[in-house]
Amino acid sequence: SDFSLFNLGIPYLYPGNTQEIIDYGLLAIAMSRFSGAWVGMKMVTDVCDGGGTMEADPDLPAIRFPGGYQKYTDPRLVPPITLALENEVNIRRLEAVRQFARLNGVNRQNNAAARVGILSTGKTYYDLMQALRDLNIRDGIRIGKIGMPFPLEAEFAKQFAEGLETILVVEEKRSFLEMQLREILYDQPAHPAILGKSHFPPIGELDPDKIAKVLSDVLGIKDRRSVPSPQSPAPKPQGARPAAFCSGCPHNRSTLLLEGQIAGGGIGCHTMAMRLNDPSRAISFLTQMGGEGAPWIGMTPFVDHPHIFQNIGDGTLFHSGYLAIEACVAAKVNITYKILYNGHVAMTGGQAAMGALPIPELTRKLQAEGVRKTVVLAENVEQYSDLSVFASNAELRSREELPRTLRELPSIPGVTVIIYDQECAAEKRRKRSRGQLAEPTMRLVINEEVCEGCGDCVRQANCMSLTPVATELGQKIRIHQSSCNKDYTCAMGDCPSFVSVQTKSGTGLKKNSLPKLPPADVPAPRQMVKAGDGYRILGPGIGGTGVVTINALLATAAWIDGLSVATLDQTGTAQKGGAVVSHLLLSEQPIEAPAKVNAANADLILGFDLLGVVHPGNLNTACAERTVAIINSDVVPTIDNIRNRAPVSGPGQMLELVNSVTNRGRNIFLDANRLAEGLFGTHMAVNLFMMGVAYQAGLIPISLDAVEQAIEWNGVDIERNLQTFSWGRKYYEDAAFVESVAVPNRDRKEAVPFDRVSELREYQNEAYAQEYADFLEKITEPSLKETVAKYLYKLMAYKDEYEVARLLTKPSFERGVRDMWASAESVSYNLHPPMLRRFGVTKKLKLGAWFRTPLLVLKNMKMLRGTPFDLFGYAAHRRMERSLIQWYRDLIEQVQTNLTPENLPQALEIAALPDQIRGYEKIKEVNVAKVKQQAVEKLAALKAAQAGLLVVGS
């Protein structure tokens, strides 16, 4: 930006905080009107994404205008008049700008008598001030703040340099101020030494810590800062929290391709499909906004691939994407545009796209532009009652027809279009919470005993609400109900475990009837910290859960109390479930520091997300003598955990890491997700609940009245939010009481002892269970016996039609479903019976509550299993499942024969191989083939190792 504006001859101002955005903005407007020049403003992320208290006096800034300058312009852009215009733009106007800046004090200095001066600008100036504060440097240095980096005002620069021996220029990126300063001072007598890029890198951004290090070197002083040095290694099982498509996001499904197909990426939420490393979303290139599909025009003559898909969001389409489509039509290339029509510009706040057309009108426009065929894939086909409004070459289909459409359109020469019509999931959720959209009454529940943990539902839905859980029966998938967005795509997984629950309209998850906490029930905090000249709060959390809202509530409350406030919300793609970090600076004095918490400067870490807390950049803000941590100890799965079906590691190592760099004795760790969902029925209450805990601990220097007023001003679910805050305060005072009130989290069922022998008795009969027990008696090594007990059971209790019927009608499951919902009216079963597949039934059938009776009948027919009357048992798949039982017994007997203390770990690996035999039908068959191959290789290695030991021993 600096050099672009410089080359264009455009003066610009550089605000470093919220106050300066207003002040400099007004100055820039006045400067432009006075001089006739375009005047720019340099805005950086840390300023734009921040906020704070400011002086809103309409008479400030007091703007003065120099005299003696007359603007000149001439519309005749031909020589020799252009010479006069060049003089106007590059000389007269810039000189007028300098005079204006000088008269209005746009650049300022502290006029200290000193040998060393430091010059800086914008956001970096406030980083400099924080660095000086961290180094405890209060005076003896002349500080200059440049409000207008270009053109650098020469008179100010000369006055600033007077009497100095050294000037350190603190600026980001390439030398710019330093370059201008050298040019101004070069011919001055006894000019000072100028340092800058000799000490600061020309890339990346500067922060107070980098600046403090350079100041220590230049000034020859000791760095007195206390920077944390963790005593424990950083936990390796978890990485950073990447952004992901929201639960129920249409892009989870719309970006899918068939095998061998490729797509181009573009600008929008759908770009995140690139980081999934998923062959079924094979994105080959990424373009600028509005260039979607254009690279294919140039690539087509040089590649053998005959066709490509191109993803494009509706916001981009209506902004500039039409041009690329028109170019592809003109170039006669074979391309299918996937217009991802979700009705909102979701990546940047959910606003409506400017110039948006209704889908029927859009199909007509595309036809007029030369598009050969358009297929509209709609979530709700019934909304289009009059098909005549669509273009004649357009066809309306259900979104379930995506695979068919992906097969058909590449065969049509030229440009074709898929319009995937499904509203943004985040906006749906927001509308539902505000009562602007009806809440669906159908919910899905996974029967975890039927679930095989194969992850096919995850492959279908790519949904953040499908969380992996470790159970006694192995890894399973569970729907996190309070974050589920009711998209239902997961039920397309090839698995009979999904049960549809029809709830009464206006009801949902069963909520605890909480007694209201009167103010007298929670005393005022016994001791409260003071804001003083700077109290800093760091809030790492998960995007979309209200972290930014908490920061805004606290900032508002502090303003009500008369404190100075500065905030920064580092969000990035946080709205999509990625990491978000909020920074809050409270002070009893005017703030001249960045809102961003730097190394060893956090007073409170309000850790809404443990993964975010242990990120090195966030841990670096802690100081063992200063920082108190209030941490949500629950580890929420990342999209990588979910896609890879990897259970989340426990919090132990990460919490110990937090303790090692903070005030261990004052820290509070709590499973806030379990408590919030137990108390309020939703994970969205977590952050406000934790804010209440921190407040009652005396760690938020704001009055109770101000906090409650800020919650009221927010205007959303006021009474419940006040109660959430109060219950968090109550938890600090009496954790045991709050724990006793919170209902057990419905998504975290307590483990109960699992009796495999009894289950096999229910599965078949006493003899079958005894057969299992007898085989286990043959195994003497305890750990091997424990492993075989798990996986022999898994293979013996294979889930045929009789067993699925038994598990779906199991009283404990049916009771759990009823207890989960405030008003469950009926249950339906989503089944794709193998027998019907042979007759061409290609998708699941939704069978209503009436089907429970046939399931009970089928369950009681288990005595037919394995007999000549078992019609299901004749299927090749069932024969394979039965054969696995004897295969595994033979495998274990061979392992036992070759077992030694030395090869026990390898033996346990072999015994646990059936854990990988997951899924139903084709999915299971593929896994069986892989496991059998592994068994052959591992058993051969075990025998070879045993043979080697015998040779050595002899």
Protein language model annotation of sequence segments:
Residues 103-187, 278-296, 319-321, 351-359, ...:
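Glycine-rich, anion-gripping cofactor-binding loops and their flanking helix/strand elements
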Residues 1-5, 99-100, 124-128, 153-154, ...:
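Structured alpha-helical segments in the cores of large, soluble enzyme domains
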Residues 360, 365, 500-539, 545-777, ...:
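Active-site cofactor/cluster-binding pocket
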Residues 1-26, 31-35, 42-47, 59, ...:
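Active-site cavity-forming subdomains of large catalytic enzyme subunits
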Residues 40-44, 119-120, 170-171, 266, ...:
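Short beta-strand segments
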Residues 15-245, 250-251, 259, 267, ...:
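Flexible, low-complexity linker and terminal segments
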Residues 98-110, 114, 708-954:
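Active-site loops and adjacent core secondary-structure elements that bind or stabilize anionic groups
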Residues 1-34, 44, 262, 267-347, ...:
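Thiamine diphosphate
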